[in-house]
Design a protein with these regions (language model features):
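Catalytic core of pol beta-like nucleotidyltransferases
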Residues: 1-32, 40-46, 56-115
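Short beta-strand->loop micro-motif that forms the acidic, two-metal-ion catalytic signature
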Residues: 51-55
Length: 115
């Protein structure tokens, strides 16, 4: 996990993670938010980013545009983030396929929000 005492402005910290989760819930309509990757495994370092899977309702027309919209809303939170947006039906199709990040998120991720 990132060392909070270093004070690096881009560092992944629990306070920034909580702020990012709150902001995503505020600006998007997520069905579920899953954190995954090095932060969840407790292996984050100064070169790590925060991996966030945003599962949306199926009526989101363009997941890529939704990801950009979320990223813009998170501009004030200074840490590197990888935001993956996937509609619910696509999530159900892909979550068990080996080699995809969806499977890692499902198997090793931490659900931080579910509506």
């Amino acid at each position: 996990m990132a060392n909070a005492s270093t004070g690096k402005p881009w560092e992944v910290t629990s306070d920034k993670v909580e702020a990012a989760v709150r902001k995503i819930i505020e600006v998007s309509r997520p069905l579920k938010l899953i954190l995954f990757g090095s932060y969840v495994r407790g292996e984050a370092n100064l070169n790590s980013d925060l991996d966030i899977l945003v599962i949306t309702p199926d009526d989101i027309e363009n997941p890529r545009k939704e990801s950009v919209r979320i990223r813009r809303a998170l501009r004030g939170i200074s840490m590197p983030m990888d935001i993956v947006v996937v509609p619910r039906t696509k999530w159900e199709e892909l979550k068990n396929l080996p080699g995809l990040i969806y499977r890692e998120a499902m198997m090793k991720g931490r659900v931080v929000y579910e509506s």
